[in-house]
Amino acid sequence: MPDLPATPPDDESPDPRIGIPGSPFADRSGQPAQAVPAPRRRRPSRRIVLTAAMPAAAAVVGLTALTAPRPASLGAPAGDEELAAALAPHLGGHRRVAAILVEDGQSRLAGFGTGEGAALESSEFEIGSVSKTFTGALLAVAVERGELATETTVAEVLGAEAEGSAIADVILAELATHSSGLPRLASAAAGGGSILAGMLRKDPYRGRDAQQVIADALDETPSGRGEHAYSNLAVALEGQLLATAANTDYATLLTERILEPLGMTSTYAPVTVGNLRETARRGHGTSGLRQDMWTMDGSAPAGGIRSTPADMTRYLTAMIDGSAPGAAAATEVLFEESGASSTAMNWFLEDFGSGQPITWHNGRTGGYASFVGWDPSSGRGLALLSDTARSLDELAVGVLTGEVAL
C-alpha cells in the first residue's frame, strides 16, 4: 500500500530532530528548554487526523493492494570509488543516491544509479525541507541589506492585510525557528484531504498559491507560541513575506539572491508542475511505489526546491566557508535550548554526542530524502540526496561525528 505519512516534507515525527541517534530529542517527552528571548518549551505531541479520510483511504487500499512495487535495489556506484564503497552498506532500501563529502575545502562526489561524470553531477533531486535553509539565507540577506530585521512583524510586512490577525505581531525570527505557535500545516489545508493526497501519492501542498498560504496563516490562532513546534506553514509564510517585502515572488527572489551568485544554475523552485524542467523525475515512497513530484505551490519556501549534486556541492562548500549569500543564517542563533541544541535561521545546531555541534537540516517529500550538514569545528560537511523517501539522517550524522568510517 502507499505511504501514509506524506504530509510533512521531512519525516513523520513532529520535529525532524526526533529519532536521530545521539540527538537530545531522541527520547525526550517534555524536557524544558529556554528560547532566546522566548520562554522554555516542550516537545510537541503528535497529531494525526485520519477520520475524514477513512472511506477514501479504504478504497485506495483496495486498489493499491493489487500493485506490488519492485524491491529497492541500490544502483551501480559511480564517482569516488572509496566514498561509494564506504556508504553503500548503509543505503539499504535506496535506489538512486548522490553523496557529497567536503573536507579541508575539497569535495568528493559519489553516486548510485546516477551514471558517471556529467550524468552524476546533473542528476536532479527534490531536496524537501533542506529548502528551508535557502529561505533562511534569504532572511539573512534581507537583514544584511537593511530591508528587514529578525524582529520585523507580519503586520509590518503585510500592512492592512494583517489587521485583526492573531499572528500580526509574530516576528520573522519566530517563523524561522518554529516558535511562532503556527501549526505544522494550515488548518484549511490539513486533515483528510492532505492525508488522501499522500495516499494517492500526490503533492499534498499543490493548489494553494502564495496569497492563499498567507491568508491561511493569517486565519490561524497561534498555540504554544515561544515553544518549538516544527511548522511548514511558518516557513512557507516566512518565504512569502520575504518575497512580498522585496516586491517579487519567492522563486525569483531565490534565483536572484542565492542561486545566481553561487552559480547554481540547475537549482530552482518550480512552484507549479508547469515549471518543472525536463530533467525532473518522480521518486519512490518507502513502499517502493512511484510518487508524484512535489512543487508545493505557495508552500515552496518550506520544501519545494530541486537541485543537483554539482549545485549542492557549491552550496555546501560556500556555507561551510561562509562565502554563500546569507551564510549568517547558519550561525546567528535565534532560539537556544538549555541542552545541546539551538536553532539559527532555519538551520539546526546540535551536539549528537561528539562534543561538537553539527549544523544541519534534513528533507523528505513523498518520493525523496535529503540531508545537508557540517561540523564547523572540523569543516567536514556532507550532503546526501536520494530518490527514495527513506531517512538518511542516521548515516549522515554518523559520517559527521566519525561513527561511520570513510
What positions do the PLM features span?
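Catalytic loop of the DD-peptidase/beta-lactamase superfamily, centered on the K-T-G motif
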Residues: 2-111, 122, 243, 248, ...
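Hydrophobic (often cysteine-bearing) scaffold residues that line and stabilize catalytic clefts
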Residues: 79, 127, 131, 135, ...
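Short active-site loop at a secondary-structure junction
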Residues: 95, 116-175, 221-231, 300-303, ...
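Short, solvent-exposed coil/turn elements at secondary-structure transition points
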Residues: 115, 160, 272-273, 353, ...
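Aromatic/pi-system hotspot detector in well-structured domains
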Residues: 134, 235, 283, 374-376, ...
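Short, surface-exposed loop or secondary-structure junction motifs
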Residues: 165-366
